[in-house]
Every structure is written in structure tokens, then in C-alpha cells.
């Protein structure tokens, strides 16, 4: 990369001000190597910039050298553990389509229905829609691995979270 003066490593924290930091997250899965960034204010997580790893109501595909297993680990360890109030800033907006995917598997999901109405007709290029980790827990199928309705849709009752995640990722590839 021309003019590169510094590289970043997973776990590194960059001080932005006396009260603001940026934590570098290792987030493989969408690609072999991927970094995301978590902002902290006085040590409290505020927002996460997820690139193509976590989308509003979805996750990234693994077509560019990534691994569904690595993506599962990243979502489970890096994002699912964040507090509800953390805002999510993905690299792209596929919210309406991803909500439709959730509803194809979990038609009774009222949060997904409500958000789909909310974003109908919204141009994400002009009016970005921001969700939180708490929102994602209510309508992102990849955060709802224990949903009986999703498990039944995949014919995976009593499967492990990993098995449900991998089946969701495979289904989303062809949906």
C-alpha cells in the first residue's frame, strides 16, 4: 500500500483522545484476514465498524477466501458478546433483503416485520439506517441460532449453534 507508515494488529488499541479509543478486532470469515474496529468512550463500547463481516440483519458471505467456520467464531466471539447499545456500522446496507431472509425462516419475528416496514422505501445511500447489537439480537437470524422457528425451518431441531449458523450461511448463499 503506497504511503503505508503503520500496520494494525488484532487486539491493538489506538488512543484517539483522553476518553476515546479504537480497538482493532480480528474478524476472519468473510475473507481469510479481516479487521473490524470497536470505538470505546471511557472504556465503554459505543460502536463497531464491521466492514463485510457483520451486516444489519445478516453476515458476510465467504466467497472471497473466507471460511464459514471462521465466520461463526468471529460472530460468536467478537460481536455476539458486545453490549446491546453498541451501534453497528457495516460496509454495505442490505437491511431490507436480510430482514426478508430472516422472515423466510422465522415468519413470526415481529421485530423483523417492524424493521422491514420502517426501512421500506428508504434509500440507504441517502439515509443510512443504523442498528444496535440489541436490535441485531431481535432480528438477525445469525444472532438467533436458538430460535426454534429458525431451527425448524432448517430441519435442525436441537442442533448446536455452529450447525445452525453453518446451515444459515449455506442457505443464504442460495436464497
Q: Language-model segments: what does each one mean?
A:
Residues 73-87, 94-175:
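Accessory terminal helices/loops
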Residues 4-104:
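Catalytic core of the metallo-beta-lactamase
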Residues 1, 49, 109-113:
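Short hydrophobic/aromatic-enriched beta-strand-loop microsegments
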